Curated annotation (Swiss-Prot):
The keyword Cytoplasm applies. Keywords: Cytoplasm, One-carbon metabolism, Pyridoxal phosphate, Transferase. GO terms for biological process: glycine biosynthetic process from serine; tetrahydrofolate interconversion. This is Serine hydroxymethyltransferase, cytosolic. InterPro entries: PyrdxlP-dep_Trfase, PyrdxlP-dep_Trfase_major, PyrdxlP-dep_Trfase_small, Ser_HO-MeTrfase, Ser_HO-MeTrfase-like, Ser_HO-MeTrfase_PLP_BS, SHMT-like_dom. Gene3D superfamilies: Aspartate Aminotransferase, domain 1, Type I PLP-dependent aspartate aminotransferase-like (Major domain). It comes from Candida glabrata (strain ATCC 2001 / BCRC 20586 / JCM 3761 / NBRC 0622 / NRRL Y-65 / CBS 138). It is an enzyme of class 2 (transferase). Homotetramer. GO terms for molecular function: glycine hydroxymethyltransferase activity; pyridoxal phosphate binding. Its main location: cytoplasm. Its cofactor is pyridoxal 5'-phosphate.
Length: 469
């Protein structure tokens, strides 16, 4: 049979991007060039591997597969089922748990939806949860709200009450958390962070959850790669549910996973009857059909590949170096006189206070971007505004992937110190009537040529390190 459509159509569906859409291809090339010639210090970012890219760009994205392996709402899913089952198997193996005690959903599309899907599975509207306060290092999806506004949609569906860090130490105040949890009696206690640099005491969190009758949910989105490698403690011994993204320290594609307990949850004190966990069906139902339709099968395949890599000695070597590089950040910043929230780090990142320097995170972030350093402004304990917060968050995973070591991270801190000093000088030069953030940015743009030599130095230096594409 002859091809029923035109030759132009055939060329459109079979031609490569360079032939069919050079405009988009050029933007992609520009972004690759930016990544190659920049220092990426955003703690939630990483550079994934070539084989993960190979799996992402496949015809698996053509297939609709609503439902779960063996129970789909569409035909033709024989191989999709194989991929999803393999991904689930590798997820359990990567985190050193067994299928008799744990199950995992690999269809959830991203971290914040994964958390919402867990809440909806286990709570009725307006039931209660507790999570770490956002300016103290928590995450929006743990129910953040201010006095005047519910910021996260989670806080409109459910009631949320934050716990805090000790303002003197920057460490979670577990004693106050316990007292408040016993009074508030949340249905879910969330142990997870986005800008908290110390290890969470999962054993203590488990004890608190038991005292108030809550499920303990651990959001390990930032640290899951470190957990898989076994270089920091695992939450699986203590948690009922564990959620994670897959593209941060785990170094996979953009996605998420929800792990849930199987087996016996408790034993009735009076009757001795065993009470099983009932998490698997509610969570799976919440993901599909509750919140999503068809899963992204190409992403699940790429995640399976990343999880295979996460179970290797080379991945443990990488995560060990991530911790060393984070310590290098800590040591060099402190040597240069900076204050770090919680006085340092146990993980992959540091949170640097800029209050003592007379500038804020938004201004330093802007200057850093002008010299090809990507980091992010971040709230620190005591902040009132997330738009002009008092700190910057700096992570080690991305540049460690590219092969940088401790001395390289010392050098990076010295670059940031130059950016901070430039921001200080620029801010102090502005008149009182025109010293807002927009005025600062305009002034930096006006004198950006002063930063050109430093930008060129960083541009050339970063090109020496490989970038998988």
């Amino acid at each position: 049979m002859p091809y029923a459509l035109s030759d132009k159509h055939l060329k459109m569906v079979s031609g490569h991007l360079s032939e069919t859409d050079p405009e988009v291809e050029q933007i992609i090339k520009d972004e690759v060039d930016r990544q190659k010639h920049s220092i990426d210090l955003i703690a939630s970012e990483n550079f994934t591997t070539t084989s993960v890219f190979d799996a992402l760009g496949t015809p698996l994205c053509n297939k609709y597969s609503e439902g779960y392996p063996g129970a789909r709402y569409y035909g033709g899913n024989e191989h999709i089922d194989r991929i999803e089952r393999l991904c689930q198997q590798r997820a359990l193996e990567a985190f050193h748990v067994t299928p008799d005690r744990w199950g995992v959903n690999v269809q959830t599309l991203s971290g914040s939806p994964a958390n919402l899907q867990v809440y909806q599975a286990l709570m009725k509207p307006h039931e209660r949860l507790m999570g770490l306060y956002l300016p103290d290092g928590g995450h929006l999806s743990h129910g953040y709200a201010t006095e005047n506004r519910k910021i996260s949609a989670v806080s409109t569906y459910f009631e949320s009450f934050p716990y805090r860090v000790n303002p003197e130490t920057g460490i979670i105040d577990y004693d106050t958390l316990e007292k408040n949890a016993i009074l508030y009696r949340p249905k879910i206690l969330v142990a997870g962070t986005s800008a908290y640099c110390r290890l969470i005491d999962y054993k203590r969190m488990r004890e608190i959850a038991d005292k108030c009758g809550a499920y303990l949910m651990v959001d390990m989105a930032h640290i899951s790669g470190l957990v898989a490698a076994g270089v920091i403690p695992s939450p699986f011994e203590y948690a009922d549910i564990v959620t994670t993204t897959t593209h941060k320290s785990l170094r996979g594609p953009r996605g998420a996973m929800i792990f849930f307990r199987r087996g016996i949850r408790s034993v009735n004190q009076k009757t001795g009857k065993e009470i099983p966990y009932d998490l698997e069906n509610p969570i799976n139902f919440s993901v599909f059909p509750g919140h999503q339709g068809g899963p992204h099968n190409h992403t699940i395949a790429a995640l399976a590949t990343a999880l295979k890599q996460a179970a290797t000695p080379e991945f443990k070597e990488y995560q060990t170096q991530v911790l060393k590089n984070a310590k290098a950040l800590e040591n060099e910043f402190q040597t240069l006189g900076y204050r770090l929230v919680s006085n340092g780090t146990d993980s992959h990142m540091v949170l640097v206070s800029l209050r003592e320097k007379g500038v804020d995170g938004a201004r330093v972030e802007y200057v850093c971007e002008k010299i090809n350093i990507a980091l992010n402004k971040n709230s620190i304990p005591g902040d009132k505004s997330a738009l002009v917060p008092g700190g910057v968050r700096i992570g080690a995973p991305a540049m460690t992937t590219r092969g940088m070591g401790e001395e390289d991270f010392h050098r990076i801190v010295r670059y940031i110190d130059q950016a901070v000093k430039f921001a200080e000088q620029t801010q102090s030069s502005l008149p009182k009537e025109a010293n807002k953030l927009k005025d600062f940015k305009a002034k930096v743009d006006e004198i950006a040529d002063q930063l050109a030599p430093l930008k060129k130095e960083i541009y050339d230096w970063t090109a020496e390190y490989p970038l998988a594409v």
